[in-house]
Structures are given as C-alpha cells and as structure tokens.
Amino acid sequence: EKILIDYSEMFWKKHDEMMAKKFGFEKLERYDADFFTSWQKLMEEISTDYTLFFSQLESLEEGSDIIEHFKNSFYQNLNKDQETLVIEFVENYRQRLSYNQISKEDSRKIMQKTNPKFVLRNYLLYDCIAEMEEGKTELFDKLWNALQKPYEEIYPEFSVKRPEKYEGVVGCSSLSCSS
C-alpha cells in the first residue's frame, strides 16, 4: 500500500513539474495543481487541440484578441460563455506567469523545449498507410523527418487540427480502451 501511495505522490509531482514547463513557469508554486486542473477542465469543455493550444500560448502577446489568437486550436465555434472561460483562463495564466523571476523570453524558451510542434496523429498514419499501399513514400518521408525534430515546425501543414473528414472515425477522433 505504501508503494502505491508513494507512486501516486511521485506521479503527480512529476506531472505538475512537466505542466509547469509546458506553461513556461520557472518553478512550481503552491496552487499550480489547481491551475492545471482548471486548464484541463477548460480543454475538455471547449474541445481543444492541446498541441496547437500550447503552440499558440507561446506566441500570445499582451493586448491581442484572445479568442482570435486561439481559434485555430478549437474544434468548434465557442459560445459566449465558453469565450468568457477562455478569456478568464488566459487572465489567470498571465497572473500566474507574473510570479516568474525570469524574463518572458526565457519563459517562452522553456515552453519551446517542452511543447512539441509535431505529434504523430493517427489520421496522418491512416493517410501514410494509404499512400504507401499505392507505392508512394512522400508522406512517410515527411513524417519521419518531423519525428526526428518534434520541437521544430518543419512542415506547417502538420500544425493543424484533425481534418473534419476524420471526425467520428475510431482511432482518429476518439480512441477505445484497446487503442
């Protein structure tokens, strides 16, 4: 039982340390676990592409239109209540970021080292397999190259949401327990 308790504590400590880096925080603060939980709830509420969200968070500037800035990471149009949730979250994020002792640029560098620009997505594998069955290897070669440097945006065409044609396709828009 002690092993399970220790594992749980260690897991959540490492999780929170990783999340702090994803958000560009130089160190964990006392209430960061609550901040991460509120972010997770928001992402679930508004159906967001996490990879794109963090990429856009890196480039968020003061004074920018928050909803417009993040709209490419949302899988649906947001209603006013959802927009308010996003705006409030970003305000909380900026407040939390102000606790950093490092520069905004150093914070951004932490984010860039932690948040990949490329994540191999199942729909890309579907397309790659289909092409390879036709004897083509162009997509395979691009995927291979992108996998070698996931923290660099080598192919901007991979930095997009899952195409609508894959909505509802098991393994592309949702995963089963056996996936």
Label the predicted regions.
Residues E1-S179:
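Regulatory N- and C-terminal appendages and interdomain linkers associated
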